[in-house]
Amino acid sequence: MGSLRVSTFAVAVVVCLSILLMSPTDGRRVCDSAAGLCSMLFSCNTQCNSLGRNFTGGECSDARFPGLSVCYCCHNVESSAEMESM
């Protein structure tokens, strides 16, 4: 009975790993386009979405001056494997 449990567990692990390896992976998210100053994440997302350039939101990051934050708009970058297939 113990060997049946071990083999069932091994099959489950193989199936899970196969699904994970075969599922498409999205590109990574890069936030590198400055879009002005922001005070909170909500305002930064609004700024980036209003630009309408396929941005997926934005992030407020601290500037070098105290009390100031810079809004960086984010976009998805495709993985290198997807770029090579194009």
Curated annotation (Swiss-Prot):
Localisation: Secreted
Family, as annotated: Belongs to the DEFL family.
Keywords for this protein: Antimicrobial, Disulfide bond, Fungicide, Plant defense, Secreted, Signal
Signal peptide bounds: 1-27
Keyword Signal on entry: yes
The protein, known as: Defensin-like protein 97
Broad class of the protein's primary localization: secreted
Disulfide bonding pattern of the chain: 31-74, 38-60, 44-71, 48-73
Gene: LCR85
A Gene Ontology biological process term: killing of cells of another organism
Keyword presence, Signal: yes
Record's GO cellular component terms: extracellular region
Domain of life (superkingdom): Eukaryota
